[in-house]
Amino acid sequence: MRQPASEGLAAEMRRLAEASSDASRALSRAQPRAKDEALRAAADAIGRRAKEILAASAEDVAAARAAGQSAAYLDRLALDPKRLDGIAAALREVAALPDPVGEVTATWRRPNGLSVKKVRIPLGVVLMVYEARPNVTVDAAALCVKSGNAAILRPGSDALRSSLALAAAFAEGLAAAGLPAASAQVVPTSDREATFELLQLDDLIDLAIPRGGPSLIRAVAERSRVPVVKHYQGVCHLFLDQSAPLQQAIDLALNGKVQRPAVCNALECLLVHREAAGRLLPAVGRALVDAGVELRSCPTSTTILARAGVPAVTAAPDDYGKEFSDLILAVRVVHDLDGALDHIARYGSLHTEAILTRDLASARRFEREVTASAVMVNASTRFNDGGELGLGAEIGISTTKLHAFGPMGLAELTTQKFVVEGDGQVRS
C-alpha cells in the first residue's frame, strides 16, 4: 500500500489538473484552423529552440548513462538534430490531418419526425504516462490538441529535462494560436507520487493512457480511479499454415522479427503447422539465424532445425508468451490450425496476430476466431501501425477492448454524443 503524498504535492497536482480541465473546455470550442496553427507554430518553435532542447537532452542522457542504463535505453532517450527535425515534421503532419471534432458519423430520422445524429466530441483531459521517450511528449500533445483534448504528460524521470524543453516550445505554438497554455502540460516533478495523485482525480481527468513496460502499465491500472486504456506488450505470433509459400514465410518472419525487434508489433513467436514444418522450418530458420536471431524452439522444431544444421536452443516454458524486444524468437510446431488458435488464445497479448496461408477457409476462420487489435492475413505483424493502416499519426496501440482497440489516432481520442432535433415533439 502506497504512502499518501504530501499535502503540497497533492494540491499541486489538483491545480495542474484543474488548469487542464479549464483548457479542455476552451479546446472543445476551438476552430480547426486555430489548432492547426498551434501545431505548425510549435514545429517552428522547436527549430528555434533546438539548441536548448538538445542541451536538455544531453543532460538527460548523461544522467541516465551514469545510472547504468543500457545502450538501447540511451538511444531511445537521446535527441539529435535529425530526430528534432522528425518531431517537428510530425507536428506538421498532424496539422494536415482532418479534424475529427464535429464529424457526424451517423444520422437517421424517427417515425415521429425526430432527426437523430451521432457527432464526435473530445474526451476532455487525457493523462499520458510513458517511459523515457521524449518524442512521445510532442506526439501526444499534438494528437490531443488536434482532437480537442487537453494533455497532461508524465514522462519517465530520465526524460524530464528534454520533455520540459519540448513542452516550452509547444507552449509557444499554443500562445501563437491563442490557445491556453494548459492545453499541454508536462508534470514538472520526477516524484512518482505525482502520477498516483493524478490517477485519483477522476473528477478532472477523463482518460489515462499508460505506454511502456508491464510494470508501468500494471501500476497505473491497479491504482487509477480514472478510466485506463492500456498500451500493453506485444506478444505477436505468425502462424505458417500447411499451404504457406516458402519465400513469403521467410519474408514475413524476417520483417516481423528483424526490422525493428524492440517495437510492440515485432514478431515474438513463430508457429508452424506440423505438415509444413519439414518443408518450411529449415529455410526460415536459416534466414533468421543468418540475420542474427536466436531461436528458442520446441522439441519437434529443434529436431527439424538440427537436421538442417540450423542452431537453436530448447525453449523454456516462459519463452512462450514473452515479449523479448530483441533478436530472439520462440518457435513451436503445432498440430494444425486449432493448435495455433489454442496457443494464441493462451499466450497472446491481444496486440497483433498473423497467418500465412493459401487456404481461404483457414484465413477466414483465423480472422473470425483470433481476438487481437489487428489480425493479419498474409501480411507482416509490423503493419499494425496508424500510419501503415492509413489512420495517420497515433498515440499508441491499445490492447484494451474499451474504449479503443488497436492504433489510437485522432478519431480514437474522441467519443460521440447524440444530437436530437425536433419540432416540439413530446413523448407519448
From Swiss-Prot:
Pathway of action: Amino-acid biosynthesis; L-proline biosynthesis; L-glutamate 5-semialdehyde from L-glutamate: step 2/2
Pfam hit, one: Aldedh
Catalytic activity: L-glutamate 5-semialdehyde + phosphate + NADP(+) = L-glutamyl 5-phosphate + NADPH + H(+)
GO molecular-function terms, A-Z: glutamate-5-semialdehyde dehydrogenase activity; NADP binding
Keyword Ubl conjugation belongs to the record: no
GO cellular component terms attached to this protein's record: cytoplasm
Keyword Metal-binding: no
Keyword field: Amino-acid biosynthesis, Cytoplasm, NADP, Oxidoreductase, Proline biosynthesis
Any GO BP: L-proline biosynthetic process
Protein localization: Cytoplasm
Broad enzyme group: oxidoreductase
UniProt EC number: 1.2.1.41
UniProt-listed InterPro entries: Ald_DH/histidinol_DH (IPR016161), Ald_DH_C (IPR016163), Ald_DH_N (IPR016162), Aldehyde_DH_dom (IPR015590), G-glutamylP_reductase_CS (IPR020593), Glu-5-SA_DH (IPR012134), GPR_dom (IPR000965)
Signal sequence bounds: none
Main location: cytoplasm
UniProt record similarity statement: Belongs to the gamma-glutamyl phosphate reductase family.
Role according to the record: Catalyzes the NADPH-dependent reduction of L-glutamate 5-phosphate into L-glutamate 5-semialdehyde and phosphate. The product spontaneously undergoes cyclization to form 1-pyrroline-5-carboxylate.
Protein name, UniProt field: Gamma-glutamyl phosphate reductase
Organism in which the protein naturally occurs: Anaeromyxobacter sp. (strain Fw109-5)
Lineage: Bacteria, Pseudomonadati, Myxococcota, Myxococcia, Myxococcales
Gene: proA
